[in-house]
Amino acid sequence: MQKTIGDIMNNRIERFLKYMESEGIKKAVILKKENINYFLGKYFMSFSVLVFEEQPYLYVGKLDKDYAEEHFNFLEIREFKSWEEIFKGCDGVEKELSIGYLKYIDKEYKIISDKIKEMRMIKDKEEIKLIKKAAEISDKAINWVLNNLDEVKNLTEYELVAEIEYIMKKHGSIKPAFDSIVVSGKKTSFPHALPTKDKIADILLVDIGAVYEGYCSDITRTFLLKDDEEMKKIYNLVYEAKKVAEEHLKEGISAKQIDNIVREFFNDYKELFIHSLGHGVGLEVHEEPRLSNKLKDDEDIILKEGMVVTIEPGLYLKDKFGVRIEDLYLVKKNGFEKLSKAEISEY
């Protein structure tokens, strides 16, 4: 029999309640929206607080109580009255808790964030399904750009980003997963730059993500719009680096190790690779694990089946141009499944 969303959420809830019991935590309060949505199984945009005692309670504002009762019927819904009520007897909080809330806590407490982070790093079947859908949506936008490059060359960056975000919205994205990076020319030499009213020219970098039912995608493509040998050389080096990473991406490799492998592949160009190789994706577009050579030994993570990560090598030539190619992957025991499937241009 197919599991309902309530069955899936109850499994997550039971795992967290067992953790609380093992740690001697009697009452945990969760305020971070992404952590709440993890236990809800759906995107809930309104104010809410999730409280775990012997069972979980979702506190919402008066305006949202009817909606919450209809959509989250596997939880008891309560109307928010006061922070004193929420935190009374609380002994488990997130590390992100603002200092202003501490005045409501009258006993020693433990940090629960590491457990939630550990749970969220390994995606279950329902999460993978939603991430795949988000990736499918951003693929549609990337493929539109690829198939309409002649038209794109006549647009400004503002006009193109509007078209891209419209396509994603039309196909079910709640919102962009982050501020869309749609830039051309010298601005591509900055890993993170915002679109402007400039006309698209020479080289185009598109880094976008969709959000479907709260779950994110992340994909980058670079398009060469003129015949330039240096651009081709750098582009193909980045493309090959991505393939090198794919050869090593599987359960058992460490986050730091796979970054270092790509950095060494770049050889004389590795100083131009100025960011980490990738990051986890789920309810947040940037979450654990980080694939970075800067991780300390106690921060390094062994990749496991069920993790969803990006691989995004890039090289950036100051005052000239930059190239980045990024895809989204589900880690498996003996390899991976590529979740983003938009075509990659070859030059």
Curated annotation (Swiss-Prot):
Entry keyword Manganese: yes
An MF annotation (GO) of this entry: metalloaminopeptidase activity
Gene Ontology process terms (BP): proteolysis
Keywords, alphabetical: Hydrolase, Manganese, Metal-binding
Cofactor note: Binds 2 manganese ions per subunit.
Residues holding Mn(2+) 1: D218, H279, E312, E326
Gene3D superfamilies linked to this entry: Creatinase/methionine aminopeptidase superfamily, Creatinase/prolidase N-terminal domain
Residues bound to Mn(2+) 2: D207, D218, E326
Cystine bridges: none
Pfam families found in the cross-reference section: Creatinase_N (PF01321), Peptidase_M24 (PF00557)
InterPro entries given in the database record: Creatin/AminoP/Spt16_N (IPR029149), Creatinase/aminopeptidase-like (IPR036005), Creatinase_N (IPR000587), Pept_M24 (IPR000994), Pept_M24_MAP (IPR001714), Peptidase_M24B (IPR050659), Peptidase_M24B_aminopep-P_CS (IPR001131)
Enzyme Commission number(s): 3.4.-.-
Needed cofactors: Mn(2+)
PANTHER family: AMINOPEPTIDASE, XAA-PRO AMINOPEPTIDASE P-RELATED
Family named by the database record: Belongs to the peptidase M24B family.
Name the record gives this protein: Uncharacterized peptidase MJ0806
Lineage: Archaea, Methanobacteriati, Methanobacteriota, Methanomada group, Methanococci
